[in-house]
Amino acid sequence: MTPVSSHGLAESIFDLDYASWKIRSTLAVAGFVFYLGVFVVCHQLSSSLNATYRSLAAKEKVFWNLAATRAVFGVQSTTAGLWALLGDPVLYADKALGQQNWCWFHITTATGFFFFENVAVHLSNLFFRTFDLFLVVHHLFAFLGFLGSAINLRAGHYLAMTTLLLEMSTPFTCISWMLLKAGWSDSLFWKANQWLMIHMFHCRMILTYHMWWVCFCHWDALTSSLHLPHWALFLFGLALLTAVINPYWTHKKTQQLLHPVDWNFAQEEAKGSRQERTNGQVPRKKRL
């Protein structure tokens, strides 16, 4: 395919009538279906090819597939977010009201992804009889925030796209957790990935400071273009990210580098280890 035809294909994908609610809702549904497909394909491939995956408990398998799905979304979000932050002249010129067709595409598909995340979290909680309030609130804020951007035709795209850039850590988080479950926490690759992941969380903190700066510099335009509930939700969510979520996860990931532990399932593993010791068996290192 020639560069000209490639450029034309990209334009045809993004050059849609985004003023139409039908187009936006269709893309949101497409985002949901696509990432559901990623989840299912990951399960099928891991079941066939990965010994570590087959040895996991059902709850851990769900987490494994969700981590892989989030990593794929993280690649999409990081690519789009970096271009919005560093490369797009329209968004750079007007950070409050600037809009681009390619941004509409990512905002609507991200809405579908975050809806998938909420469905997956609630079904997992129901099936395994668990409830993580922190995780539920986090995903609910993300979905409502992007739903507000997908609905509001006047909303600028810069802040929405830089919010997507916060997903830059998810591919590294996925790799870290999978290798940890495989027993590779002593490997140089795991440690290097962990260092990069910690760096990404520091970059997330810097990015939230930049987003506050954009909010303060364009306060009037943002207040007039966003619906009050959406604007309040965004500010509250950004405050949580800045003051609680980013510092907390940066601390946890740094702690994990020094003491490699899967705290997501620490209690289950501790219980399993006690049972194995009771039966006179020594836990074996898992392999990929």
UniProtKB/Swiss-Prot annotation:
Disease involvement: Defects in Cln8 are the cause of the phenotype motor neuron degeneration (mnd). Mnd is a naturally occurring mutant It is characterized by progressive motor system degeneration. It has intracellular autofluorescent inclusions similar to those seen in human Cln8.
Residue ranges crossing the lipid bilayer per the database entry: 26-46, 71-91, 103-123, 131-151, 225-245
Gene Ontology terms, MF aspect: ceramide binding
PANTHER family registered for this protein in UniProt: CT120 PROTEIN, PROTEIN CLN8
Keywords: Endoplasmic reticulum, Membrane, Neurodegeneration, Neuronal ceroid lipofuscinosis, Transmembrane, Transmembrane helix
Subcellular location: Endoplasmic reticulum membrane; Endoplasmic reticulum-Golgi intermediate compartment membrane; Endoplasmic reticulum
One Gene Ontology term from the biological process aspect of the record: nervous system development
Topology in membrane: Multi-pass membrane protein
Organism: Mus musculus
Location of the region described as Disordered in the Swiss-Prot/TrEMBL record: 269-288
Cross-referenced Pfam families: TRAM_LAG1_CLN8 (PF03798)
Protein's name in the database: Protein CLN8
Domain TLC: 62-262
